[in-house]
């Protein structure tokens, strides 16, 4: 310790000698380069893997880079409309308008709960003019009847020609049964349900009874609401409304304004009421400029959606009956039909598709710079795991880093002489001889033999992972190294 203190005290005198300055510089460079080479050899990664094996599935995509996302809040975007969501393969849900605390559970299966009414039974036949007769004791029969009317029109049910709908009520719970046993009727109803909630597979080809059961339930966040499904419900009711058609153009430049019509030269902010569980999120002029170049981005489609319909969105805040008519008038302005059709085709082909609800982007937390958001795709009614599109966000992070480095290089060229950069480069190159540790090929993580890279999952020696993704114990593993 005394020698170290003496050395530090002599530094002012040492730096007067050019050779001593060179020795200090070489020593610092050698130590730093040695640490970097050890890191690149994989030794630190191996130690980190052994500590976190079986406990963590996280992965870093670079210094200060994080994968983040935001979710559009459909209840604030379309407050007067019922919102739709999918719970599982057989159950879907329609939530009442204005964030109601009740909803309608749509069950598709083969369980018969109601039979044709007999004298003295509680079972009734539903008619187009007396929907409320199925639930006279409900607290809000008019709202429930309105949602059911929209639903039946959306699936194109004809009360005069199609099979009779049965219903009954017990205290505050009512049940409605649609019989889909007739093949042509089943194909028509299920195809319309698929447009609202997603594919139900080849349901109508099954043998036996085929039924849709509707019952009222209490809303308790059973699933995440999908505003695209609500728009589909509007479109499928469009034959009852007078609509003006307008489609988004493919190639044009556009600017942004706030909800009051004032110009926003600094970029665009998604207001807090548009997002789920997130604060105000702003995207600068860089993102807007990218949207003028990249016309295939789902995020840019969403920006156009909000930008073209500022007045419509402001009107949606007035909870009046006239609001519904103006919403029907503006539905083709809210989102282009070809975008919905494109994603529905991808859904039918079992290809991950965009539901225009959740978007991901790579954010550099140190510089507060982010990439252009991209759609978080959906398959079979659920969002893809981060590892399913790992290559995409790693490539996106590489592009973001390249943009940052290019910008920093241009700025540094204005302040730093090129000769100084060359001097640093050649002095660093001299010490690359310490890269011999790369010859050791130290492994960094485990692979299951015969399968691809399990990253970001960290497998134990029993081939398990704490997140539950790898559950089969005792599979043969081998050590591998990050390329």
Swiss-Prot record:
Binding residues for Zn(2+) 1: 57, 457, 465, 467
Positions of transmembrane segments: 18-32, 34-53, 423-443
Cleavage, annotated site positions: 58-59, 249-250
InterPro entries in alphabetical order: Arena_glycoprot, Arena_glycoprot_zinc-bd
Binding site for Zn(2+) 2: 445, 447, 453
Glycosylation sites noted in the Swiss-Prot or TrEMBL record: 73, 88, 130, 179, 216, 355, 363, 380, 385
Membrane side Extracellular: residue ranges: 2-17, 54-58, 59-422
Cytoplasmic side: 33, 444-483
Gene Ontology MF term list: metal ion binding
A biological-process GO annotation: receptor-mediated endocytosis of virus by host cell
Keywords annotated in UniProt: Disulfide bond, Fusion of virus membrane with host endosomal membrane, Fusion of virus membrane with host membrane, Glycoprotein, Host cell membrane, Host endoplasmic reticulum, Host Golgi apparatus, Host membrane, Host-virus interaction, Lipoprotein, Membrane, Metal-binding, Myristate, Transmembrane, Transmembrane helix, Viral attachment to host cell, Viral envelope protein, Viral penetration into host cytoplasm, Virion, Virus endocytosis by host, Virus entry into host cell, Zinc
Disulfide bonds: 85-223, 186-204, 269-282, 291-300, 354-375
GO-annotated cellular components: host cell endoplasmic reticulum membrane; host cell Golgi membrane; host cell plasma membrane; membrane; viral envelope; virion membrane
Site description Important for GP-C-mediated membrane fusion, residues in chain: 33
Lipid attachment, kind N-myristoyl glycine: 2
UniProt-listed Pfam families: Arena_glycoprot
Task of the protein: Stable signal peptide (SSP): cleaved and functions as a signal peptide. In addition, it is also retained as the third component of the GP complex. The SSP is required for efficient glycoprotein expression, post-translational maturation cleavage of GP1 and GP2, glycoprotein transport to the cell surface plasma membrane, formation of infectious virus particles, and acid pH-dependent glycoprotein-mediated cell fusion.
Homology family: Belongs to the arenaviridae GPC protein family.
Domain remarks: The cytoplasmic domain of GP2 plays a role in ER location. It also contains a zinc-binding domain that allows SSP retention in the GPC complex by accepting a cysteine from SSP as the fourth ligand.
Protein known as: Pre-glycoprotein polyprotein GP complex
Naturally occurring in which organism (per UniProt): Bear Canyon mammarenavirus (isolate Mouse/United States/AV A0070039/2000) (BCNV)
């Amino acid at each position: 310790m005394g020698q170290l203190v003496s050395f530090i005290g002599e530094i002012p005198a040492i730096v007067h000698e050019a050779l001593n300055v060179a020795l200090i510089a070489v020593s610092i460079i050698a130590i730093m380069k040695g640490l970097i080479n050890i890191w690149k050899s994989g030794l630190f990664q191996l130690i980190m893997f052994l500590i976190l094996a079986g406990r963590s599935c996280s992965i870093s995509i670079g210094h200060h880079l994080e994968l983040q996302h935001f979710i559009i809040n459909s209840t604030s975007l379309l407050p007067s409309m019922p919102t739709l969501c999918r719970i599982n393969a057989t159950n879907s849900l329609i939530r009442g308008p204005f964030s109601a605390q009740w909803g309608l559970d749509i069950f598709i299966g083969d369980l018969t709960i109601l039979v044709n009414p007999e004298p003295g039974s509680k079972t009734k036949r539903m008619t187009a003019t007396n929907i409320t007769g199925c639930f006279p004791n409900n607290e809000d029969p008019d709202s429930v009847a309105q949602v059911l009317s929209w639903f039946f029109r959306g699936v194109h049910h004809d009360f005069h020609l199609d099979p009779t709908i049965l219903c009954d009520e017990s205290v505050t719970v009512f049940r409605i049964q649609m019989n889909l046993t007739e093949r042509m009727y089943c194909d028509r109803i299920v195809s319309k349900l698929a447009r609202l909630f997603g594919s139900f597979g080849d349901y109508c080809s099954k043998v036996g009874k085929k039924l849709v059961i509707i019952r009222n339930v209490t809303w308790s966040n059973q699933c995440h609401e999908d505003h695209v499904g609500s728009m589909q419900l509007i479109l499928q009711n469009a034959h009852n409304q007078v609509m003006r058609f307008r489609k988004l153009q493919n190639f044009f430049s556009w600017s942004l304004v706030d909800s009051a019509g004032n110009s926003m030269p600094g970029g665009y902010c998604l207001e807090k009421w548009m997002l789920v569980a997130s604060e105000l999120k702003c995207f600068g002029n860089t993102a807007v400029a990218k949207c003028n170049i990249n016309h295939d981005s789902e995020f840019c489609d969403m920006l156009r959606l909000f930008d073209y319909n500022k007045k419509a969105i402001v009107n949606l805040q007035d909870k009046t009956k006239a609001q519904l008519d103006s919403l029907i008038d503006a539905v083709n302005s809210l989102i282009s039909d070809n975008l919905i059709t494109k994603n529905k085709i991808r859904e039918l082909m079992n290809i991950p598709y965009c539901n225009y609800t959740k978007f991901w982007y790579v954010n550099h937390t140190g510089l507060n710079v982010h990439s252009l958001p991209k759609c978080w795709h959906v398959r079979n009614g659920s969002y893809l795991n981060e590892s399913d599109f790992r290559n995409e966000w790693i490539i996106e992070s590489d592009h973001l880093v390249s943009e940052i480095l290019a910008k920093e290089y241009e700025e540094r060229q204005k302040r730093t002489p090129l000769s100084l950069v060359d001097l640093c480069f050649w002095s660093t190159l001299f010490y690359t001889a310490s890269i011999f540790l790369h010859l050791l090929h130290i492994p960094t993580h485990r692979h299951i033999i015969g399968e691809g890279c399990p990253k970001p999952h960290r497998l134990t020696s029993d081939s398990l992972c704490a997140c539950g993704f790898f559950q089969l114990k005792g599979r043969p593993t081998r050590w591998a190294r990050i390329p």
